[in-house]
């Protein structure tokens, strides 16, 4: 039985009318299936005219907005949910029939892809931190070495956009990618079980999204559910919590120590730290644009995944320096004051901030100091893991936001402010040439900003503002 046979004449409900939900809508419509789209928001579209346009363009879709429709959900045979919807806290789980199939868009893609004569190959990446950097680096390497790759999932375009009606059943898609590089969040993994990836990696694990997953053990199990869905597991030797439940045919590891055969690591050669594949020297980390040991791990994870897919190791290594990183991830901010300003606004959890500090402190020279700006919405995280590093490696802590006071309590001399602009102004008064000011909040941005991107942009603007306009 093909996936389409299983979907025919079924009550299908798409939960959420955001980017993911609308990609599901377009795909189901292209297969000539009838379905409903349910969103608790009264108006998920930009305006009524846009909603009317969708209703006209997709006549087999029933749109129900303003609440989670009990009668619709309780009679569903198949529910396709958007990853941002918490089925438990929204009260949806209690409405779902016992035999209802609950999946996400990535699972739907995999069901379709698996049924094709020539399925698209997949590389999958998850983890608390660094996954966007790793998949973007993989995509950059693929382009440089001539591999036709698509970036999808939690980054890039919705994964169902890779499929089209006229070629779902064909052995080849029009402009079919050689490989799909998919970034997966824990929310997407909750509804994913049918992926057949060449290789997958859980980069690291730290407290995150515990407001939804409740316990670290549950979060860990969800993340590691990626491994049974891959032939090769790419695991970090630096983060045991990320690989305790590995179930794969083959394992390739990466870490900061000297590697074993067919694994990746670092070794000191002629007073330089060199990236190694077994006994083979690849490149000195000094030659790479992304600083810090956490980024060395990201580079090695990408190389291991690409190697798993059969890509030339020498060709990948030659092109590592061409990837300049992503905005808001340990991004250097240009300034005229000879202070090192680092925008790490994407550090929305404790683990990301720990990684940033641990990776950047070794780059400071002499008596140069590290000033950290942190705080925001911690989403119920335990900040105690920051205590040692804040007291040993951070010379001045500046906090703000909903949970700023809790972070400030971990040291004796923190400065607490109300706005990010004030935080930058305080840092400007303290920092001297050569010092580093790091925005790495260890928290989400939703208490003060629309998203982490806006937070990072406001940090950059405040850093680059002239002295007189900052007061």
Curated annotation (Swiss-Prot):
Residues annotated to bind ATP: 127-133
Xref: InterPro entries: Mur-like_cat_sf, Mur_ligase_C, Mur_ligase_C_dom_sf, Mur_ligase_cen, MurD
Swiss-Prot/TrEMBL keywords: ATP-binding, Cell cycle, Cell division, Cell shape, Cell wall biogenesis/degradation, Cytoplasm, Ligase, Nucleotide-binding, Peptidoglycan synthesis
EC annotation from Swiss-Prot or TrEMBL: 6.3.2.9
Pathway membership, UniProt: Cell wall biogenesis; peptidoglycan biosynthesis
GO cellular component: a single term: cytoplasm
Single GO term (MF): ATP binding
Pfam family, one: MurD-like_N
Localization terms from the record: Cytoplasm
Superkingdom to which the source organism belongs: Bacteria
EC top class, as a word: ligase
Annotated catalysed reactions: UDP-N-acetyl-alpha-D-muramoyl-L-alanine + D-glutamate + ATP = UDP-N-acetyl-alpha-D-muramoyl-L-alanyl-D-glutamate + ADP + phosphate + H(+)
GO process terms (BP): cell division; cell wall organization; peptidoglycan biosynthetic process; regulation of cell shape
HAMAP family the UniProt entry points to: MurD
Family: Belongs to the MurCDEF family.
Family annotation (NCBIfam families): murD (TIGR01087)
Biological role: Cell wall formation. Catalyzes the addition of glutamate to the nucleotide precursor UDP-N-acetylmuramoyl-L-alanine (UMA).
Protein's recorded name: UDP-N-acetylmuramoylalanine--D-glutamate ligase
Gene: murD
């Amino acid at each position: 039985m093909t996936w389409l046979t299983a979907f025919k004449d079924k009550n299908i409900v798409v939960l959420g009318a955001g980017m993911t939900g609308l990609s599901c809508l377009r795909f189901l419509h292209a297969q000539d299936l009838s379905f409903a789209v349910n969103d608790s928001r009264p108006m998920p579209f930009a305006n009524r005219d846009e909603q009317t346009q969708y209703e006209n363009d997709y006549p087999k879709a029933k749109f129900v907005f303003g609440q989670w429709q009990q009668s619709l959900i309780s009679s569903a045979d198949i529910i396709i949910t958007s990853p941002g919807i918490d089925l438990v806290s929204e009260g949806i789980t209690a409405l779902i029939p016992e035999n209802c199939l609950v999946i996400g868009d990535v699972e739907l893609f995999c069901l379709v892809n698996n049924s094709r004569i020539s399925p698209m190959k997949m590389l999958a990446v998850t983890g608390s931190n660094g996954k966007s950097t790793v998949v973007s680096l993989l995509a950059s390497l693929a382009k440089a070495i001539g591999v036709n790759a698509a970036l999808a999932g939690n980054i890039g375009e919705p994964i169902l956009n890779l499929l089209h009606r006229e070629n779902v059943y064909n052995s080849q898609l029009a402009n079919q990618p050689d490989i799909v590089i998919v970034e997966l969040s824990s929310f997407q993994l909750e509804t994913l079980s049918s992926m057949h990836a060449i290789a997958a990696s859980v980069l690291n694990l730290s407290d995150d999204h515990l407001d939804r997953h409740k316990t670290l053990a549950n979060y860990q199990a969800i993340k590691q559910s990626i491994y049974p869905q891959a032939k090769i597991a790419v695991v970090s030797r630096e983060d045991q919590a990320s690989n305790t439940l590995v179930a794969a045919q083959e394992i390739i590891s990466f870490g900061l120590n000297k590697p074993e055969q067919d694994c990746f690591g670092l070794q000191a050669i002629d007073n330089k730290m060199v990236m190694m594949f077994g006994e083979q020297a690849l490149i000195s980390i000094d030659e790479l644009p992304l600083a810090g040991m956490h980024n060395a791990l990201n580079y090695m994870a990408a190389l291991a995944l690409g190697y798993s897919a059969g890509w030339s190791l020498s060709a990948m290594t030659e092109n590592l320096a061409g990837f300049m990183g992503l905005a808001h991830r340990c991004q250097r901010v240009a300034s005229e004051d000879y202070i090192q300003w680092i925008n790490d606004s994407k550090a929305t959890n404790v683990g990301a901030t720990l990684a940033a500090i641990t990776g950047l402190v070794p780059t400071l020279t002499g008596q140069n100091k590290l000033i950290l700006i942190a705080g925001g919405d911690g989403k119920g995280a335990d900040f105690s893991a920051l205590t040692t590093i804040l007291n040993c490696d951070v010379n001045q802590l500046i906090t703000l936001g909903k949970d700023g006071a809790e972070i400030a309590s971990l040291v004796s001399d923190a400065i607490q402010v109300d706005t990010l602009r004030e935080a930058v102004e305080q840092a400007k008064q303290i920092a001297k040439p050569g010092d580093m000011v790091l925005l790495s909040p260890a928290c989400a941005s939703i208490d003060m900003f629309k998203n982490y991107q806006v937070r990072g942009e406001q940090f950059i603007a405040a850093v680059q503002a002239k002295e007189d306009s900052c007061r």
